[in-house]
Amino acid sequence: MRANFVDTVMARLDGEVATIWATVLLRLEDRPDVALLRRGLRALVRESERLNVAWNDARRAWVPAVRGDVEVDAVLVEGAEPLSEPDAVARIINTRVDLSRDVPLRLHLHPMVDAAQGPWLLGIQLHHAIGDAKALAHLLERLWLLCAGRGSESRPLEPSTLTDGKVLLAALRQPGRVLGLASPRRRLLAQRGMGLRRSGDTAGHALLATARLTLPQGDTDLQASEVFFSALLAGVALRESPADGRIRLRMPVDLRRMLGLGRTLGNGCSAVPIELSLKEVRARLEAPRELARFLRSEVQRVLDEGVHWTTALECMAVARLVPARVLRKNARPGLIAEPRTNTLVVTYLGRMDTHFTEAPFRIRSMRSHTATWGATGLSFADTLNINTAAFQGLWTREELRDFTERVAGWASSGFGLRAEVLAP
């Protein structure tokens, strides 16, 4: 199975800094039926061609690797010892995998010490080389149906149909998208973003914290995604020194929708750099909705210019032409370069409720994580969860907590939202 340019970059970089999982973390009301989950997982893996592959780095391709029931049963890891949520989360998000051998899917079930928040934690992970968070959401919808014996109600997810060729043809329809590679402002790898102050120069275990904000009912003018992005901008502006600089967000853009490719199991995103002056962000800190509008207009400008096609070409060139040793050699230095290629990698996953309506358990709360220095956001029930991520050795737990508290405090006071922070 041919790997597209996103698969290739993710597989070739995997493990250099961390295992690149797309992770959701669920606090549950009761212990789920493990036998039911394992039956569903067996059926899911049997029908999913893309879960029956292994990465061949020499060929830069997926090769067939049919999974037996024993291998699939090992996907669900049960913990016996009650853990605190920070300890369980740290164990889950730092799980390693070998793409040349292992099933690229993991479920972790842990009993919790602080049972009042939900006595069980279920972590679900899909390796980003196989699919992104959107693909994981679709995969889980399918898993819930298989667990309920209702697999015939929908079709199995097909492997990704996003190919390098389709992206190349779409990009070439407007020559300016190719010429845009000459502009550093339109390149993901251009070192233009201000780096965040850090306490060290090594990237160790992944860290996660969450700002949980209660969304108001009926405020149709307040979009959760805009709260997410503007609160992160504010967190940077409040934390960093007063000197001017560029805040550079790296933000994914879904190409599947633009190319009409539908629901598949795979990677379907390009990414765009969103550059904003720190001075201009600071000037709007007392006017949160104005900051949200300012950010919205900048994102729209970048999309109107087709920068997502330019950066897709850039990523394609890196995936196909750059030797693996060069990719891996530059992964860690890129985190501490000054200026950096990005200040934060940020992803808003959208409203997640619809993907879990058929889940065979009751969910108390939800968080997410991607192994990066940045943040993922999601809405679930009446909450917006801003999940901030970093690495030990760059930030301490206290630094991550401080940044997350600044994000939560600004969003709470600016938009009138009740906030709490979960941090290691």
Model-found features: residue ranges?
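Acyl-thioester-dependent acyl-group transfer interface
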Residues: 1-61, 82-105, 237-424
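Non-catalytic, low-complexity flexible loops and terminal extensions
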Residues: 1-8, 12, 130-216, 406, ...
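Hydrophobic/aromatic-lined pockets within catalytic cores
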Residues: 131, 144-148, 232-241, 300
